[in-house]
């Protein structure tokens, strides 16, 4: 039966727009119109289903190509941080005592609801800031030290690109070695296996999900890698015409180019995710390889969580979630 399910999975061509995210002992699944969070707390499964409201539905201009990529990226980050905070609430840090005086003062001034919004906004800001610092500004800063020794813009761009890739891969590898992150990456694998099972048209059972691949071509890991690659290509082109020796000019331009870079990456991933041919499979390979670091084989209890989260967002109208 397992072999039959595996063969059926490989033959399937359906691609769903449903995507997910691994949480602390849980999984977030986002479908058309709603998202679901399922967490395995010490007291059992906790479920939270929310209706999805997209900013680009309210403001159509934000749904235009390129622009929608940046909007979707920020929106996903905000929702992802909220989901992580929700899951973390069920596993409080035993080493943390009573709330600090600052926490008490902040809650008193803002109220609990506003304080949660403030913390979420701060977390998103720090996450976005760290990403920009590590993968965009730090490589430019480090490459600035070689300016006195090179005269070619092409060589400078090459060195900066190599530094950027080294930082990216080092970050991925270091994250994969963290013990606290190992189980999160197992849930990441569970999310992928469950999506594959659903796309294959198989019943969502632990047995059927267990045999699926844990590397998915439309994973966020692939998106981040493509962002880095696109930024290298765009930067190399732009800095061939701009004052490439001025480190501060380069940093400022990196910031200005972020929106088009993320936008182009989003459109690229949409195309690759929606087509299955030799070219798209080749383009998807680097992202699939990187998932060796960001996914681990899940156990059956994790698959149960991912299955439940997916079940909660599958639309009643068949095909509504088609890619």
Pin down the residues of each PLM region.
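Polar-ligand-bearing catalytic/cofactor-coordination segments
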Residues: 2-23, 27-29, 99, 150, ...
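Divalent-cation
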Residues: 2-92, 99
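Multi-pass alpha-helical transmembrane bundle typical of ion/small-solute transporters
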Residues: 53, 60, 70-73, 80-99, ...
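Hydrophobic alpha-helical membrane-embedded segments
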Residues: 64-86, 160-185, 258-274
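Juxtamembrane "helix exit" motif at the C-terminal ends of alpha-helical transmembrane segments
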Residues: 86-87, 127-152, 227-253, 266
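Membrane interface segments of multi-pass transport proteins and intramembrane proteases
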Residues: 104-114, 142-159, 239-252, 271-282, ...
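Select subsegments of transmembrane alpha-helices in polytopic membrane proteins
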Residues: 117-135, 217-228
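Hydrophobic alpha-helical transmembrane segments of multi-pass membrane proteins
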Residues: 122-133, 158-162, 166, 252-259
